[in-house]
């Protein structure tokens, strides 16, 4: 197995880029359909619409909007539907049959069904079709069945609904025809903090639900992504307040810190509260207690045109950043942190709720927060390139461009070491390790992700006898000699493999 120890030092002053394929991003948020709490890799807008619904949730559409924008630029999204207390809609015909939506949520409420009977070869056969919003289009979801078949099987699962036999159903029962009957009783689970009376309970439920989702995302070998966000939901007033009353004392920000610092290969995007002035951001988000190289905060919220909704809506700044990423990553170099008037631009920004000028922008950057600013020549763009690391000794230690490039190198080196740990010829593996490391880092150097590197293996006689490779990789992001140091211990002896 590969045992990895990492020590990082960086005091450099130059931004970094890397010319690689678009990174995978992880998004968490409500949708109108699909499995709740199941991380799902999505590769196209059509696939997203098929799995999570083509329409947006009424209260928190931000994650779905960001996902579709990123997918439209040939990116890959690891999407997890968030639904607290979501239930599936259904419809019953007496005690004979129940039709239930396969997934919880608004989509279930909008399902309509039609049931018609016909005599086929002397047997009464029923045909059920499903539609959405009472439209005539049938979503390839129709089924012919007999009552004896349903009685024998107990249930019949279709693409969008499941038929279940009722207690009174017999093979001689007669089902009344149904025409465009809507399913009822579904709850989409995305209306958080609906009243002051239930806010604390709703918050605890959100924290508990999020814990379950983030636990699934802890292992980078199972789910790979470079950026994770839960757009807009971190921006609800009092979400991080009253920490002592929250489940296990954890806030949303705390959980993202725990996840990203455990994985050490991704950055979490955090939104401020909608009403926050720039002086209040640190207090509102409890940022005075959070110093992490794996969080990036953006400000302020903005109004955006959303063609699918045929309206303008208020959007969290993390979506602005992801929108800029979708375009910039596809055209330029994806590991360059999106900032500046040429790359940090959003395609549909109308205005920001607070107009950020040069002085406010400088103040926000001094707090390691990335502002959305306006310039008459360039329009709205991100004027910051920071992770939230206010404890850093130097400004550049917190540059998001360096963080992303190093995260990528770290992830690829880790994969390489795991592969090498299963090679059984120790001397052969030593040369192969250095060869593969050089090939990886030469590519990053050519793509301007790093300025230089050095890789070497401890040639201890004892290590060689035990089949252990101690690999040290030093990466220099800039012409300065300060470095990121990666220490890997690879155990690849036959005895270790057979233990």
Features from the language model and the residues they span:
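Structured, hydrophobic secondary-structure cores that serve as assembly/anchoring elements
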Residues: 1-92, 97-100, 215-499
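Small/polar, repeat-rich beta-turn/loop motifs that tile beta-strand-dominated architectures
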Residues: 2-4, 9, 13, 25-29, ...
């Amino acid at each position: 197995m590969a045992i990895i120890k990492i020590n990082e030092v960086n005091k450099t002053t130059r931004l970094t880029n890397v010319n690689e394929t678009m990174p995978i991003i992880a998004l968490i948020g409500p949708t109108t359909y699909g499995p709740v709490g199941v991380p799902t890799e999505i590769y196209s807008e059509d696939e997203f619409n098929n799995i999570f619904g083509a329409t947006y949730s009424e209260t928190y559409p931000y994650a779905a909007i960001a996902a579709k924008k990123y997918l439209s630029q040939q990116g890959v999204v690891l999407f997890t539907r968030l639904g607290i207390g979501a239930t599936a809609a259904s419809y019953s015909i007496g005690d004979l049959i129940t039709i239930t939506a396969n997934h919880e949520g608004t989509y279930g409420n909008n399902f309509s069904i039609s049931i018609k009977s016909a005599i086929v070869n002397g047997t009464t056969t029923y045909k059920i079709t499903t539609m959405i919003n009472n439209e005539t289009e049938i979503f390839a979801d129709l089924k012919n069945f007999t009552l004896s078949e349903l009685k024998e099987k107990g249930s019949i699962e279709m693409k969008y609904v499941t038929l279940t036999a009722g207690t009174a159903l017999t093979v001689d029962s007669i089902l009344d025809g149904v025409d465009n009957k809507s399913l009822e009783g579904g709850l989409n689970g995305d209306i958080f903090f609906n009243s002051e009376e239930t806010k604390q309970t709703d918050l605890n439920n959100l924290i508990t639900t999020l814990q379950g989702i983030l636990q699934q995302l802890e292992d980078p070998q199972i789910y790979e992504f470079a950026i994770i966000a839960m757009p807009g939901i971190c921006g609800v007033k009092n979400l991080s307040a009253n920490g002592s009353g929250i489940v296990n004392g954890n806030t949303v920000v705390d959980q993202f810190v725990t996840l990203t610092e455990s994985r050490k290969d991704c950055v979490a995007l955090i939104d401020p509260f909608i009403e926050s002035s720039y002086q209040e951001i640190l207090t509102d988000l409890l940022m005075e207690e959070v110093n992490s190289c794996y969080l990036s905060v953006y400000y302020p919220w903005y109004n955006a045109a959303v063609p699918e909704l045929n309206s303008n809506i208020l959007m969290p700044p993390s979506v602005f950043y992801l929108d800029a990423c979708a375009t910039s990553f596809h055209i330029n170099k994806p590991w360059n942190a999106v900032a500046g008037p040429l790359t940090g631009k959003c395609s549909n920004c109308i205005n920001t709720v607070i107009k950020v000028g040069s002085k406010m922008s400088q103040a926000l950057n001094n707090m390691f927060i990335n502002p959305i600013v306006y310039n008459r020549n360039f329009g709205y763009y991100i004027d910051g390139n920071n992770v939230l690391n206010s404890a850093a000794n130097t400004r550049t230690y917190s540059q998001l461009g360096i963080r992303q490039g190093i995260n990528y190198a770290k992830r690829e080196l880790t994969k390489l070491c795991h592969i090498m740990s299963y090679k059984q010829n120790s001397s052969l593996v030593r040369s192969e390790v250095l060869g593969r490391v050089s090939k990886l880092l030469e590519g990053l150097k050519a793509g301007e992700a790093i300025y230089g590197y050095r890789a070497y293996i401890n040639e201890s006689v004892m290590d060689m006898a035990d089949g252990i490779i101690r690999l040290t990789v030093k990466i220099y992001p800039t012409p300065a000699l300060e470095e990121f140091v990666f220490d890997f211990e690879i155990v690849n002896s036959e005895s270790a493999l057979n233990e």
